[in-house]
Amino acid sequence: MKPLIIAGRGIRLAKEQKRFRQFIERCQVPFVSTWGGADLTPTDHPLNTGILGMCGQIGANKAVQECANLIAVGTHLAIPHTTTLTDKFAPNAKIMCVNIDQDQLANMNVKVTPWCKGVSEWLDSALFFHAERSWIERCLELKKMNEVGRPKVAYGVNSYVFNDIMTRMLPAGTCMVIDGGGTALYTGFQSSHIKEGSRLICSTGMSAMGSGLPEAVGACFASGILTTCLIGDGSFMLNIQELQTIKHHNLPIKIFVINNDGYLAIRDTQKGFLGGRHTGVGGDKDKSISFTPILRQSLAYGIDFVRITSMNSIEEVIGSVLDRDGPCICEVICPGDQEMRWRQGFIEENGKFIPQTLDNMKEAA
């Protein structure tokens, strides 16, 4: 058998993280997660194949395309997870979707066998089964494809390398907030190393730019634990007033600002689909907008500031950030032309862009 489970946020909403983990370990069934289910287990869990979807990891997406039986639990398989090519999603699999909301099951874009049950009820009645050892080993091979590596950069720091190192240095039980802006979103979901008891928070329903700072404030107040926020320089300015909230309450939030000279994700879209005609995105080729230096913003609010400018200084600077008791802003200088590590591929044919399935994601050069 080649079964695969898609673990969604509904599992946590049902407070069934522990029983879900016991189930997959007893059955020895590999799983991938949605964005909202990414922190159900540590990244290192041997059955965790990664995060699926358009901003997800290539190994997880390949596992979905290769499996024979797919069980989606606590998710409704939204387009960010399946893309618009719903007829080519998990083409070799029989798909079952476990969801407590009948209306969502009735409006699925993917053809599934619906099971309108809560996660707890499903776990009570689920049959135990085992995956073939060869399939488990195949998923472990696919998981290796998720690794970031150490790509070369002309200057500054590759955001994926930075985030990989940073999240590995964080203690277990950290609350990690990812902003909804493109660069932070792709970087966060494709390179975060989640440890036991850590949380990964993001506005997954909206993927809203600028959501990171207010989410970090709320998460820190609610959890009372070390909180980090990964955010781009463009998104950083959208809710900058929250810096005063952070300063006023001396919240232990470590803000890592990816400075890629403006709106990199939009710039990348303009490059790929609009012939490189850049406007409203900042950077060397577009002077229509500008950004206040992050150092000046941190000084205005009286928050500690550090900067990472090279690959060699990543660990040292992150260490100094984590050693501080209160809030800190860490500016991470990244190339303005850095490509997304993995993204949905498109082929241009006769002036049209033809989308590709997620097992053929485009890899950064």
Regions inferred by a protein language model and the residue ranges of each:
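Active-site diphosphate/adenylate-binding microenvironment
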Residues: 140-223
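Redox- and metal-dependent alpha/beta enzyme cores, enriched for Fe-S-associated oxidoreductases
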Residues: 14-36, 174
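Glycine-rich, acidic loop regions that bind phosphate or pyrophosphate groups
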Residues: 37-138, 255, 318
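A short, gly/pro- and small-residue-rich
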Residues: 19-27, 82-102, 197, 342-358
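Thiamine diphosphate
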Residues: 66, 106, 114, 120, ...
